[in-house]
């Protein structure tokens, strides 16, 4: 058994036999290492080498040793772009229409990459590469991202040897939900000890590369480094925040003009490009009040500090590659996943989950918290006016299929593979993120396999852009793009590009409040991108026949690549199905501590339902105290604990507005059953009760209960994120917490917004 592939000779003895050793799977010695650096929500005009006002010397360093692309496009959203990047196929084709968090019941949105679309990591691993994923993943259904899995779509099961990072679409930069390989792992330090997740990610990435080069340098590596930055929350170390104080006081109108002029001067936009008109909902800077300007500047400073800090981490990686003597033979691609985000409303927010709950923040509250902005005590996102600056010179934002959502920076650097004579040049051929995987495969001389892990593969749909590395490609008219067409679709927003023309239709202005009319009622615009880079001149009226052909082409491509059905109703961003075996399908939860932290989608939906929590505790001395359950962070969450005086406490923290219930008497010594109950009106206020051994102990009204609580999930027996200032985190429970049970009212209805369906009945059984 097991000898079918043996090519030696087996006799009765070794003297009569001939040994044989299979050749190891190793690429040729000239094979480059691969590094893909992925930024999050970073617009076309944010990086310094693209005209941005933030110092990014290390991205600039890459650009100076390589090429910048100014006609490169993504899907307008994070999970879909990642799916395209890693597979070379369109996001609908592989089951990732939108966010990985949900399965809508259609093939184009399963919340995971189809296994018929093998990832770059799976292909390269089979060719002998070491493969590392560090940072944001967001390609696994989040209900499967807990310590219990299943792990079918975790990084290690999709071709990576190692993983260190976070599974969710965003995370608190000071209190991330970390996983290592196939298991959750604690944050190694506290913010007070200098922790920031971007620095931690680079520690891990550099460590993986150094280990590989030290122990098995014969194997080239593929490092996929996906930062949480610059996705909100915009958080950075204090010294970076201080550096940017006062740097944006001129306001977003002046700054946008400055970016535009820098882009023209650098040549990253064509001569004659116009600066697109102000987006609706962005007021002229001079119309803002003094307080609105103060807050807006501070929020932009936090963003700048975060990007600056991220650039410094990229510098650490580049320095490490040089120290190891491998920088010349390493192909680096740096890009963003979509345009700058408008999720900070018109005036900004100090907690990003206000956006997902549809709750703007009062200005006076932001003024009061202005010194928290950018620190671990905030969860900020900037106003849309600053996002418009980041998307200069284009229109609209992340999730839109206009240029502000889908045109992104791409830098390619490969000193030993791209002639130094082209260093610093700009390439203008139209390309899309699905083209990067085919580019890498072409460079390596690898054909896309017909089967991966026994699964027959879909055709690769991208077009290699390796032809643009040549010196003659500086002239896109002389060396035109090899792409024929590219569709875009996100939340009903649609576009189609072909032969230098783009037709685009906006279906929604806000992802949580979509246009209620049908897709056929949407207006289509037509732009000639070859002469109108910033999509300023709508030619739909003067070119009706061309527009008609483009619309027909969109529907043809949509059918070809699995775009249909297009989700056209309000709230589809968070639509999903209560799959059996998941929290959305259950109303009773039983935990036997200790249990690792659960991500929000793998925990009970405490924001959207009415619930009862019961804790079986033992306090044999009577002085035991600590946290029983915590969900969220300092900025938004809820926590149940026994205080040092022995009182049962429930603290409901709605965007730092605390409602605190405290039992009048101490919890008895010995064994007790402690209970917290909460009911709510749909999207409204609620009421909570405390019970100790079945006896009512406290009750209070709760003025606001956010439906979506936090990107940070639920802990039992401790609270590392410090939801309350009444104790010092993690305030681990010093007694015995033997059992936690949670019962909820069923509120999920298939094909509707799972997160927003709530019954008002109070649980009594």
Model-flagged regions — what are they?
Residues 2, 13-15, 529, 756, ...:
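Exposed, low-complexity/repetitive linear segments and helix-based recognition motifs
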Residues 413-415, 529, 741-747:
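Short beta-strand-to-coil "C-cap" segments at the C-terminal boundary of structured domains/repeats
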Residues 551-569:
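Charge-dense polyanion-binding interfaces
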Residues 565-765:
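Extracellular glycan-associated modules
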Residues 530-534, 694-697:
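Asp-box/BNR beta-propeller loop motif
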Residues 1-520, 524, 533-552, 566, ...:
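Formylglycine-dependent sulfatase
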